[in-house]
Regions:
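Classical eukaryotic N-terminal signal peptides for Sec-dependent ER targeting/secretion
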Residues: 1-9
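Negatively charged
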Residues: 11-200
């Protein structure tokens, strides 16, 4: 039966009934798409409407540069992107479900959620094994409190300000392998973090 459904889906896709997921080729294309939806200013004149779950339905129905609908952000195929640097920086109301994003090629997550004050979506299962830069990733992400203790961070070289001002974050990171980290300056600056790190 699964073969039948697969063939049906392929037919619908080719017939234009089902749209392929938005698949940015690189960081620039992804940033351009995210930047179009003014998450940090929703509700003000000229900005897109945002629902309580942090999604941007009007944006999902709008078109990318190729004329195809962007679709729901959580369904985007970001598997070719290698950098998430500053992707949602200052997106103060962003809290969409991006748990399904395929992140295995990403090497840079610097400032990804910097000042994304409402972000607390589940990203616990992200594959971050290629990431080397976590500087300021959750800086002032003041609501974030997801269990990312099982992230594979063995290639990370900087944890500078990673959780600075992340005042809600309280999960055990003792399993993180930090042997390649060269700077931990202000990692938990102004964050009431109180979990064991004796294995670091």
């Amino acid at each position: 039966m699964s073969i039948v459904w697969s063939l049906l889906w392929l037919w619908l896709l080719l017939d234009g009934v089902v749209q392929a997921a938005f698949a940015p080729a690189d960081k620039a294309a992804l940033q351009a798409a995210v930047g179009t939806c003014e998450w940090s200013n929703c509700g003000t004149s000229g900005c897109l409407s945002e629902t309580s779950d942090g999604s941007c339905p009007i944006f999902a129905a709008s078109n990318d540069a190729s004329g195809n609908p962007h679709g729901v952000i959580g369904e985007w195929d970001v598997s070719r992107v290698t950098s998430f640097e500053s992707l949602f920086q200052q997106a103060r109301s962003f809290n969409s479900d991006i748990s399904k994003w395929r992140t295995s090629r990403v090497t840079n997550m610097q400032s990804m959620f910097h000042f994304a004050r409402k972000f607390n979506a589940d990203i616990t299962l992200w594959n971050v094994s290629s990431v080397t830069n976590l500087e300021s990733t959750f800086f002032y992400a003041s609501t974030f409190n997801q269990d990312i203790g099982n992230w594979s961070v063995s290639r990370v070289t900087t944890l500078k300000s990673t959780f600075s001002e992340a005042v809600q974050f309280q999960h055990n990171l003792n399993n993180w392998i930090t042997s390649k980290v060269t700077t931990m300056e202000s990692t938990f600056n102004s964050a009431p973090f109180n979990q064991p790190l004796h294995s670091w």
